[in-house]
Design a protein with these regions (language model features):
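Active-site loop segments of alpha/beta catalytic cores
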Residues: 123-348
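Generic low-complexity segments that are intrinsically disordered, proline-rich and/or Lys/Arg-biased
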Residues: 4-7, 26, 101, 241, ...
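N-terminal small/glycine-rich loop or linker at the start of catalytic domains
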Residues: 19-51, 81, 87-96, 103-106, ...
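N-terminal basic, low-complexity leaders that serve as flexible interaction/assembly modules and, when applicable
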Residues: 1-87, 91-94, 131, 230, ...
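A short acidic, glycine-rich active-site loop
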Residues: 52, 111-118, 171-174
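A gly/proline- and charged-residue-enriched helix-loop-helix capping module
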Residues: 97-135
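General structural signal for secondary-structure boundaries
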Residues: 11, 48, 103-109, 116, ...
Length: 348
């Protein structure tokens, strides 16, 4: 059992570093978003979603909004996993009600990508981090993030989100050299992006591997584990001991291999991961994050409260960050979020 840490200035950061707290710190994936009326008001002031991401004044405002409403332990910078392909020069847009749309990448198009442009193009994100950092209370953790290479590649190849990632999986099998080159580009771009986020004030970063499902063990090792391992190592070569949360959604039985090989400080669990499996299969001192079903939060009521309490109890003997198993959905009533935070804050 990891000893309970003495009170620290940033409970969430302390937890990521392996210290149990008296109660789990909490943040919520997509906590700055459409379920908040104040977010919708800001969103209406800008022309496009990417414009919101690249306007530091507005991006900092929406980053801070959920912390004004709820006693959350962290802010996560408002951005998107697809800012990297945008920075690389791929055409990226967001259609209302349809999600992201990209010009699909081809093997021939890889040479047109501009890895050297990433940090310059994403300077507004770093300014947003600096603005948020200056406004945060000292006990709040600031989280940066990026999409992991496999997940970002699925969008770059298909041109949109895909529930089975078939286009990317087929591309990887039929064009292995081009796919390996694409992953290399994304690894290096991600390292540069995350290092710059740390230097702009991020306390911890999260790697979003949102599409880790639908891969066999060999593909998972090559497309998920190895690129994420390289990113963590590359970031720490410049920012020693940089704290990293990995979130390989849908990894299921391959979670232990990911945890062992990638080198993340904490492991995000989706809501399909049984608590007993996580406790039995993962190292006892490894911090975990999660894993309430977002639909339980949207539905609210006693079922949500009981499941939240079960998760807190289930991970009571290891460092635990309370979160959802995926992003909060827009239909979620703000009252349900307030009730969840209340339950977590009382520690049971």
């Amino acid at each position: 059992m990891t000893p309970t840490a003495p009170p620290g200035i940033k409970p969430l950061l302390n937890t990521v570093r392996g210290h149990r707290q008296a109660r789990p710190p909490i943040w919520i994936m997509r906590q700055a978003g459409r379920y908040l009326p104040e977010y919708r008001a800001v969103r209406a002031q800008v022309g496009s979603f990417l414009e919101l991401c690249y306007t530091p004044k507005h991006a900092a405002e929406v980053t801070l909004q959920p912390l004004r409403r709820f006693d959350l332990d962290a802010a996560i910078v408002f951005s998107d996993i697809l800012v990297i392909p945008d920075a690389l020069g791929q055409t990226v847009g967001f259609e209302t009600g349809e999600g992201p749309r990209l010009e699909p990448i081809t093997p021939e198009g890889l040479g047109k990508l501009r890895p050297d442009n990433v940090v310059t193009h994403l300077a507004p994100v770093f300014e947003t981090l600096e603005r948020v950092k200056s406004a945060l209370a000292p006990d709040k953790t600031l989280i940066g993030f990026c999409g992991s290479p496999w997940t970002v590649a699925t969008y770059m190849i298909a041109g949109h989100g895909s529930p089975d990632q078939a286009a990317a999986r087929l591309f990887a099998l039929q064009q292995p050299e081009a796919f390996a080159r694409l992953l290399d580009i994304l690894v290096e771009a991600s390292i540069d992006y995350l290092v710059a986020q740390f230097r702009a004030g991020a306390d911890v970063v999260q790697l979003f591997e949102s599409w880790a499902l639908n891969l066999d063990e060999a593909q998972f090792a090559a497309y998920v584990i190895e690129p994420n391992r390289r990113i963590v190592a590359g970031v720490r070569a410049q920012i020693p001991d940089a704290p990293v949360i990995g979130f390989p959604r849908g990894a299921a039985g391959m979670l232990p291999a990911y945890a062992e090989a990638v080198g993340v400080n904490a492991l995000g669990l989706d809501h399909g991961t049984p608590l007993a499996f996580a406790n039995d299969a993962l190292p006892p001192g490894l911090p975990v994050q999660g894993n309430l079903d977002p639909l339980r939060l949207a539905a609210g009521g006693r079922q949500m409260e009981e499941r939240a309490e079960a998760i807190i109890a289930g991970f009571a003997n290891r460092p635990h960050i309370f979160n959802l198993g995926h992003g909060i959905i827009p239909q979620t009533p703000v009252e349900h979020v307030a009730r969840l935070v209340e339950i977590v804050k009382r520690g049971s």
